[in-house]
């Protein structure tokens, strides 16, 4: 395979060093994924540059225009400190006509809403556990057709954020407390 210029995008605090010497295992763990991806791409013969994304896209714009990468390897999970803005980075890559790895903007937006994602799965015949959304300000009661234990999580938090042992509830009081806790976040 012909070597490519690969631009690796990540959070600005996770840009890995060239070498791990001098770092503690705890420090390395913070940027382990980013380091491993960059090292593997280099070992495969590709030219690699890392961009740490922070609050603006000016450095990304400059590198795309001057270096002209073939593809962006997207490890960015947030933009401007917010996980619900990662789709904007991907939209920008599309506007710049730069191919990228990972999900497209529409997929990122849809996957962020767990309720909508579940509805789409059910609509398309994919078996999924029953679920219920408790709107803020409404009475919290056991939904019809569901029984304990239940797993309670935010409809919008990214990945497993907010999930804890208390997310598994065994009675109505635990359910009410956990839903109220999530609504207060």
Specify the residue positions occupied by each region the protein language model found.
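Active-site nucleotide/adenylate-binding loops and adjacent lid/helix of ATP-dependent enzymes
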Residues: 4-10, 64-65, 109-185
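ATP-binding N-terminal substructure of ATP-dependent carboxylate-amine bond-forming enzymes
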Residues: 1-99, 105-106, 111-112, 116, ...
């Amino acid at each position: 395979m012909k070597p490519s210029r690969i631009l690796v995008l990540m959070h600005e605090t996770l840009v890995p060093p060239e070498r791990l010497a001098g770092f503690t295992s705890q420090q390395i763990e913070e940027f382990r994924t980013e380091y491993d991806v960059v090292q593997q791409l280099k070992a495969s013969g590709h030219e690699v540059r890392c961009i740490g994304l922070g609050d603006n896209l000016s450095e990304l714009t400059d590198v795309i225009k001057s270096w002209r990468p073939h593809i962006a390897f997207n490890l960015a999970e947030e933009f401007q400190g917010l996980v619900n803005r990662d789709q904007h980075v991907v939209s920008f890559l599309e506007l710049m006509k730069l191919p990228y790895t990972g999900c497209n903007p529409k997929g990122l937006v849809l996957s962020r809403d767990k309720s909508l994602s579940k509805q789409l799965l059910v609509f398309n015949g994919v078996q999924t556990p029953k679920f219920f959304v408790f709107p803020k300000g409404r009475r919290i009661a056991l939904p019809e057709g569901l029984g304990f234990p239940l797993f309670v999580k935010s409809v919008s938090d990214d990945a497993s954020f907010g999930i804890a042992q208390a997310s598994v509830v065994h009675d109505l009081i635990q359910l009410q407390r956990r839903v109220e806790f999530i609504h207060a976040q």
